[in-house]
Amino acid sequence: MACNSSGCESGCYDREKDNGSKIVDDAVSGGGNHESVCVKCKCNAPMTFGDGGFDDGRFCADCFRNNVFGKFRLAVTSHAMITPSDNVLVAFSGGSSSRVSLQFVHELQIKALKNYEASRDRSLPVFGVGVAFVDETAAFPALSTEMIDAIEWVRYTVSCLSPPAKDLHVVPVESIFGSDSLDARDRLLKLLDSVPDDTGKEDLLLHLKMLSLQKVAAENGYNRLVLGSCTSRIASHVLTATVKGRGYSLSADIQHVDARWKVPIVLPLRDCVRLEITRLCLLDGLKTVELACRSQCGINDLVSSFVALLQEENPSRECTIVRTAAKLTPFYFNKIPETDDSNVPMATQRRLKRFNLKYDGSMTTEAFCPICNGPLNRSDSSELDTFEEGQESDVLYAACCSSCRFQILPQDGSSLEQFSSFLPDHMISQVKHQKVDSQAYLREKIKDCLLLDDEEVV
């Protein structure tokens, strides 16, 4: 990729005011060896970040940024993540990955707007962009002040982006429990308190956040949900899922596209490591905010620390973990659904058919865990057929994956009954639908052995 000396063209109003240029100048001046040149363009001085990365001091500012943006753009175009007719919701947590994801989506929108204005027929519309921030104050009351400051910072960051304007949705995590905020907050706290395991509590909150994002996306007409998950986070997820016994559903979580949800999820930063993203934030002066909402004593934090240690010893370790896991067979929903909509350009429809992943028909599943929404093997959900309608807690236990049974669900019957009463209505309805689907599947398999109403036993 050739060096682009014209700059980033991000369109951010306050880039200079936030001292982004000063950061770049300081980084370049700290390079030490001014006689060396960028290994890509062979003309500009390389950047030196001093973070100990294996490629530190090899690329100039423009080439480094173009390299990271090129990975993002390749993922978007190859998997048809964003098309002109789409309405995209970017999940923004304030961290470095989500900040870069928002910036890159913003730049794609600016380019689409310029192409639209320069076109004579203006046949390709400009895709819409919204931003969603999940407010976790109800789950972490001690961080209420920090959360308020973070929300104000998010509002300011989104407002500083140049036109087209982007709607910001601040979503309380308890909103999925109902419109009554007090009752919803009470149910959330009781639900989390009923989970005895720290890792299970953290995982449950993560699932509730995803439901909150899906809810706001569906209610506001978005058809894509962009997450900022990078290679580093996915590598950690591969190991944690393996430790938790989620091997069957692992391949569903690590693909570029996940359409098992009502609003498909896309991961355009899947091929970018955290070090690259952190450097880009420093280079472009992209400010971030981190909230200490994560448990420091669970499996997730332990595995993240382990992967970070591996990465220090071998800079390619995270990529190796993700590439190895990517060899698993994807599910049928790990692709953007093909469409015959006349509003979608033919080039986009051809791209969907060309780049969609090939999957094994045996990986087709209609059963999903009501807690984590992980795909279930038919043998895992066969216990649903043995319960009556009145045994709601037992049906819930049978409908969940083995990992959620072990880490999230209470083990004794009375606590499980209480736990199920606190769950959001969405999860309860999914359990009921799953039981009906399981019974229909069982009837389909044994239909040749059933007698019709007008038949007699011989």
UniProtKB/Swiss-Prot annotation:
Pathway: tRNA modification; 5-methoxycarbonylmethyl-2-thiouridine-tRNA biosynthesis. GO terms for cellular component: cytoplasm. One of its GO terms (biological process) is protein urmylation. The keyword Transferase does not apply. It holds the Pfam family CTU2. InterPro entries: CTU2, Rossmann-like_a/b/a_fold. Its main location: cytoplasm. GO terms for molecular function: nucleotidyltransferase activity; sulfurtransferase activity; tRNA binding. It comes from the Eukaryota. Keywords: Cytoplasm, tRNA processing. It is found in: Cytoplasm. SUPFAM superfamilies: Adenine nucleotide alpha hydrolases-like. Belongs to the CTU2/NCS2 family. Plays a central role in 2-thiolation of mcm(5)S(2)U at tRNA wobble positions of tRNA(Lys), tRNA(Glu) and tRNA(Gln). May act by forming a heterodimer with NCS6/CTU1 that ligates sulfur from thiocarboxylated URM1 onto the uridine of tRNAs at wobble position. This is Cytoplasmic tRNA 2-thiolation protein 2. The lineage of its organism: Eukaryota, Viridiplantae, Streptophyta, Embryophyta, Tracheophyta.
